[in-house]
Curated annotation (Swiss-Prot):
The keyword Hydrolase does not apply. SUPFAM superfamilies: Translational machinery components. Belongs to the universal ribosomal protein uL18 family. One of its GO terms (biological process) is translation. It comes from Pelotomaculum thermopropionicum (strain DSM 13744 / JCM 10971 / SI). One of its GO terms (cellular component) is cytosolic large ribosomal subunit. The keyword Repeat does not apply. NCBIfam families: L18_bact. The lineage of its organism: Bacteria, Bacillati, Bacillota, Clostridia, Eubacteriales. Keywords: Ribonucleoprotein, Ribosomal protein, RNA-binding, rRNA-binding. This is Large ribosomal subunit protein uL18. It holds the Pfam family Ribosomal_L18p. Residues 12-22 have a biased composition (Basic residues).
Length: 122
């Protein structure tokens, strides 16, 4: 009997394929997004050094008590704004967006648009 591959396996396949092409540098680090059912996480990574430069999530102390839910588009937009603010304070303006195989829709799109509105270029 044929077994249909699950959505996470397909997403992981897309993520691996794209990660061969996307690489964050010191001049233009990679903005990585991870989405769970309850929260959303974003990091800006310099792949040359293997270092996370800036990170934000719905579990960050700045957002934890202020959001009714961490798993909706409003929370994702708040994470995008916080990430952009932290990145600009760290001197990062230009990034490469790595959606990690997720469809550019909903929470991923809300985070990306809020980060762009906050001053990040990608």
């Amino acid at each position: 009997m044929l077994k249909k591959p699950d959505r996470n396996a397909l997403r992981d396949k897309r993520r691996r394929r794209v990660r061969k092409k996307i690489r964050g540098t010191a001049e233009r680090p990679r903005l990585n997004v991870f989405r769970s059912l309850q929260n959303i996480y974003a990091q800006i990574i310099d792949d040359d050094r293997g270092v996370t430069l800036v990170s934000a999530s719905t579990l960050a102390p700045e957002l934890k008590g202020k959001l009714p839910s961490g798993g909706n588009t409003a929370a994702a937009a708040a994470v995008g704004e916080l990430l952009a603010k932290k990145a600009i304070e760290a001197g990062i303006k230009r990034v490469v967006f790595d959606r990690a195989g997720y469809v550019y829709h909903g929470r991923v799109k809300a985070l990306a648009e809020a980060a762009r509105a906050g001053g990040l270029e990608f």
